[in-house]
UniProtKB/Swiss-Prot annotation:
Species this chain originates from: Escherichia coli O139:H28 (strain E24377A / ETEC)
Molecular function GO terms recorded: xenobiotic transmembrane transporter activity
Classification of source organism: Bacteria, Pseudomonadati, Pseudomonadota, Gammaproteobacteria, Enterobacterales
Membrane disposition: Multi-pass membrane protein
Protein's UniProt name: Multidrug resistance protein MdtB
The keyword Transmembrane helix appears for this protein: yes
NCBIfam families referenced in this protein's UniProt entry, alphabetically: PRK10503.1, RND_permease_2
Membrane-spanning intervals of the chain: 16-36, 347-367, 369-389, 396-416, 440-460, 472-492, 537-557, 863-883, 888-908, 911-931, 968-988, 998-1018
Length: 1040
């Protein structure tokens, strides 16, 4: 038996080539594991990002923003500020509501953060108002994971209070029990209650006050322990009729006696079943509704969760009265399914294009089948690893697999092409497989590890962006690694069994024509390369020019954060004059809804009015506009927004701010627009001075649009200026005054009704239907120390003033948020720079600090780390290549190809009108790993020719370029066609995928043309440099 030379022994591939059955079964195992993994993987829009954010909501009906700030928000903030791991704390104190948002470091587990928050709330309990209806409630908030579904419950016959009760006790609980559902929240504020509306004149005529009534009600409705009787033979539990359940029972309550006759509550008040808060409301289209937002559990399959909800809806509807209707207003899975389907189609298209290009070059069906098996096997096998890593099928992981299509086929192409070359020379298929695989094994390892090295810096990206792209980078790395394994095992084994001289020599008309064409191309390339090698300095100047051009393009290209997606949902904020009441705002909201629902692209509309912890004031409303599916409307979301804003501008007295809802949401608070900028000061007075000046400047900038701020300091206040001396003489305290006002105008929750299913409140207020506005204050009566009734007007004057509608804090200091959008002809980078320049012209005092927030802050962070990220990728690849080649020089030759890729990518983005955003930057980093393959294949063969055949460096690199021209062209076109479907994507989520494809296609085209000529020249330059260095060292040693 002939003994094969070392390169012919097959290296690590020999065992697999010689044992085809074992190799086949191993690959089948990988295939089956991948298929099982694919079926087990959850589906989502983006990778799971557990963003440790907790929101603490405290409701105190009737309290002014100032009282909420000092009595509720400030004590809680002081306790929260002592927690470790807290990254940022923001708060919003408005009329009756305090919302504190706690954002923790990404490294802090959410359960630990919850424990710290609960401990801080417990520590602050004694500092909070004693009459707070409910303690602060905290909930986990993940801004990166919005609700998966929004449902509306309406009725044509039942009052909304009964609908709310039914939804809360039956519908919401059933949906919460579905596997995968994490939280169901209700909006609409129509919780049932008994409302007691006092007739101020009636109680005054009887010598009573509202405090007398409140005391009577709270004493008459209790629910406390009563004990039990334990006798010699039996035990008896004690119970009593201490609870009043209905409005009728409260009407009959005796609150006082006068001249021996009972005075019942119904004599001095209107008692009725109503809503706990009459200043809250939600609408679905034009109908008042109870709206349910459903959020999934972390890691749950969003598709199966939504399907389970839809399957349960018919059963839930049957259990409800016929007049009650449950409607799905929005379902995120509709767009997620479409986006994932489009990405999967692009993945299949990429595979088909890659196989087509392989056949075009190899012109042989058996040779085409081999990579046609290797590519899907590598991709499917990746799913098995993804399951163990708790990944999901999402847009980014599918993008990684689509890009991997062009990567993984490279290894198979290089192996097949090398083995085919030996078969064409007359080698037997088995010997050719052993020799070709052994010869190319080191190249495959070099290609694989140098490409994976490029992805390593992505794993160390900070903040939420790094968490997001971790799955992308690891998925791509796993696919590349499996591809290398397949290419060194299955591919040479199949070559040994499927390829032969006859099959390779068998040619049809297409084969002969394409062969002649490739021969002519290679001959032309050889002539061109010879000329280039004869003029190395001209070629070097071209290479240096690309480096300079790439730097210039990097500086001047518009920069952004993430592409704006069209997910079919628009989030809106409606703003009215600061003195607007709930009724006035509800009317304006209905006018705007009528206009919006007339747009042909709008499918449904949800709107909310009232202070509920999300809405900061009565003069604002929230809207969620659900658009028709993309294939059922003519325009993308940005055009629809522009059209809606133009239409709503005709409605007097309102301003509408719209922004498309995104899969990636970093902002922890509801904002009017996409981007935010904050001014923070030590006092509200400083903000009142500088906010208007900055707003005036910013509204004039062409780089910004829809500029607004949450600074609202013109809210109407009726200031009760009490003459303390007069009040003291009458024995009336300030607590008496506050209680009287709270009883009358605060929708005061004074008692609780307990049932087997739920708890309901008793609400006390004055009936102000006949005395609207400030005149209602004239009806307030207080009790003096001698039992007499004293009008409030006799001891106090009412002054009209202005005050903030809400008070916002950032890390315990007053703050104002300025919101803005970016016009189509500008980038976020332009807007950020314009704001910073404007800030410098104002010369703000030292006690005012500014900071970007949300997406804008993340953009600044990502932009600042981008250059270092690319440098880290280059350094990582240099280290890996240096180790593999045991050389300091050859890695530099390989890395010299990178500027050409940068020029191509940046030029393509500018021509396509795309910004240099995070997605495009990922594409450029991937290009770093792709384009160096050309140089690796050239240099490997050149070094082998010098070492084994004794060729000169010039002849060696010239021969290497000609021999590797076809696989270089094949691998580059394969990578290009793998990215082409992303570049041409037009479906749902295309905005996220397209920049990656554009950058990669542009970079590959330019680098392919230039590196075929610049790499050989640089190789020879460094070879001469190495010889010169060695001679200098040798001379020094001789002299020594």
């Amino acid at each position: 038996m002939q003994v094969l030379p070392p390169s012919s022994t097959g290296g690590p591939s020999r065992l697999f080539i010689m044992r085809p059955v074992a190799t086949t079964l191993l690959m089948v195992a990988i295939l089956l594991a991948g298929i099982i993994g694919y079926r087990a993987l959850p589906v989502s829009a983006l990778p799971e990002v557990d963003y440790p954010t907790i929101q603490v909501v405290t409701l105190y009906p009737g309290a002014s923003p100032d009282v909420m700030t000092s009595a509720v928000t400030a004590p809680l903030e002081r306790q929260f500020g002592q927690m470790s791991g807290l990254k940022q704390m923001s708060s919003q104190s408005s009329g009756g509501a305090s919302v504190i948002t706690l954002q923790f470091q990404l490294t802090l587990p959410l359960d630990v953060a919850e424990q710290e928050v609960q401990a801080a709330i417990n520590a602050a309990t004694n500092l909070l108002p004693s009459d707070l209806p409910n303690p602060p409630v905290y909930s986990k908030v993940n801004p990166a994971d919005p609700p998966i579904m929004t449902l509306a419950v309406t009725s044509t016959a039942m009052p909304m209070t009964q609908v709310e009760d039914m939804v809360e006790t039956r519908v919401a609980q059933k949906i919460s029990q579905i596997s995968g559902v994490g939280l169901v929240t209700l909006s609409g504020g129509q919780r049932p209650a008994v409302r007691v509306k006092l007739n101020a004149q009636a109680i005054a005529a009887l010598g009573l006050t509202s405090e007398t009534v409140r005391t009577a009600i709270t004493g008459a409705n209790v629910n406390s322990a009563k004990g039990s009787l334990d006798g010699p033979s039996r035990a008896v539990t004690l119970s009593a009729n201490d609870q009043m359940q209905s409005a009728e029972e409260y009407r009959q309550l005796i609150i006082a006696y006068q001249n021996g006759a009972p005075i019942r509550l119904g004599d001095v008040a209107t008692v009725e079943q109503g809503a706990e808060n009459s200043w809250l409301g939600a609408w679905a289209n034009k109908e008042q509704a109870i709206v349910m937002n459903v959020q999934r559990q972390p890691g749950a399959n969003i598709i199966s969760t939504a399907d389970s909800i839809r399957q349960m809806l018919p059963q839930l509807t049957e259990s409800l009265p016929k007049s009650v209707k449950v409607t799905v207003l929005s379902d995120r899975t509709t767009n997620i399914r479409a986006s994932v389907d489009d990405t999967q189609f692009e993945l299949m298209m990429a595979i088909a294009l890659v196989v087509m290009i392989i056949y075009l070059f190899l012109r042989n069906i058996p040779a085409t089948i081999i990579p046609g098996v290797a590519v899907p096997l590598s991709l499917i096998g990746t799913f098995a690893v993804m399951v163990f890593l708790d990944f999901s099928i999402n847009n980014l992981t599918l993008m990684a697999l689509t890009i991997a299509t062009g990567f993984v086929v490279d290894d198979a192409i290089v192996v097949i092409e090398n083995i085919s070359r030996y078969i064409e020379k007359g080698e037997k298929p088995l010997a050719a497989a052993l020799k070709g695989a052994g010869e190319i094994g080191f190249t495959i390892i070099s290609l694989t590890f140098s490409l994976i090295a490029v992805l390593i810096p992505l794993l160390f990206m900070g903040d939420i962006v790094g968490r997001l792209f971790r799955e992308f980078a690891i998925t791509l790395a796993v696919a590349i690694l499996i591809s290398a394994v397949v290419s060194l095992t299955l591919t040479p084994m199949m070559c040994a069994r499927m390829l032969s001289q006859e099959s390779l020599r068998k040619q049809n008309r297409f084969s002969r024509a394409s062969e002649k064409m490739f021969d002519r191309i290679i001959a032309a390339y050889g002539r061109g390369l010879a000329k280039v090698l004869n003029h190395p300095w001209l070629t070097l100047s071209v290479a240096l020019s690309t480096l300079l051009l790439s730097v210039l393009l990097w500086v001047f290209i518009p920069k952004g954060f993430f592409p704006v997606q069209d997910n079919g949902i628009i989030q809106g904020t409606l703003q009215a004059p600061q003195s607007s009441s709930f009724a006035n705002m509800a009317q304006r909201q209905r006018q705007v809804a009528d206009v919006i629902l007339q747009d042909p692209a709008v499918q449904s509309l949800t709107s909310f009015v009232g202070v509920d912890g999300t809405n900061p004031s009565l003069n604002s409303a929230r809207l969620q506009i659900n658009l028709k599916p993309l294939d059922e409307r003519d325009d993308r979301v940005q055009k629809v927004i522009a059209r809606l804003q133009t239409a709503v501008d005709k409605v007097p007295g309102v301003d509408l701010f719209l922004q498309p809802t995104q899969d990636l949401t970093i902002d922890t608070q509801v904002s009017r627009t996409q981007y935010q900028f904050t001014l923070q000061a030590t006092s509200l007075d400083a903000l009142s001075t500088w906010v208007p000046q900055l707003m005036e400047k910013l509204q004039q900038l062409p780089q910004l649009s829809d500029v607004s701020s949450d600074w609202q300091d013109k809210g109407l206040v009726a200031y009760v200026n009490v003459d303390r001396d007069s009040a003291s003489r009458l024995g009336i305290s300030m607590a008496d005054v506050d209680n009287a006002l709270y009883n009358a105008f605060g929708q005061r929750l004074i008692s609780t009704i307990y049932t087997q299913a739920n708890q309901y409140r008793v609400v006390l207020e004055h009936n102000t239907e006949n005395t609207p506005g400030l005149a209602a204050l004239d009806t307030i009566r207080l009790t003096s120390s001698d039992g007499g009734v004293v009008p409030l007007s006799s001891i106090a004057k009412i002054e009209q003033r202005f005050a903030p509608l809400s008070i916002n804090h950032l890390d315990q200091f007053p703050v104002t948020t300025i919101s803005f959008n970016v016009p189509d002809n500008y980038s976020l980078g332009d807007a950020v720079q314009a704001i910073m320049d404007t800030e410098k012209t104002l010369n703000l005092p030292v006690d005012i600090t500014t900071q970007f927030q949300g997406s804008t802050l993340a953009f600044q962070s990502a932009l600042g780390s981008t250059v270092w990220l690319i440098v880290a990728a280059v350094v990582a690849m240099y280290i890996v290549l240096g180790i593999l080649y045991e050389s300091f020089i050859h890695p530099i030759t390989i890395l010299s190809t990178l500027p050409t890729a940068g020029v191509g990518a940046l030029l393509a983005l500018m021509i396509a009108g795309s910004e240099l955003d995070v997605i495009a930057i990922i594409g450029i980093i991937l290009l770093i790993g792709i384009v160096k393959k050309n140089a690796i294949m050239m240099i490997d063969f050149a070094l082998a020719a010098e070492r084994e055949q004794g060729m000169s460096p010039r002849d060696a690199i010239y021969q290497a370029c000609l021999l590797r021209f076809r696989p270089i062209l094949m691998t580059t076109l394969a990578a290009l066609l793998g990215a082409l479907p992303l570049m041409l994507s037009t479906g749902v989520g295309a905005e996220l995928r397209r920049p990656l494809g554009i950058g990669m296609v542009g970079g590959l085209i330019v680098s392919q043309v230039l590196t075929l000529f610049t790499t050989p020249v640089i190789y020879l330059l460094f070879d001469r440099l190495a010889l010169w260095t060695k001679s200098r060292f040798a001379r020094h040693e001789e002299e020594a």
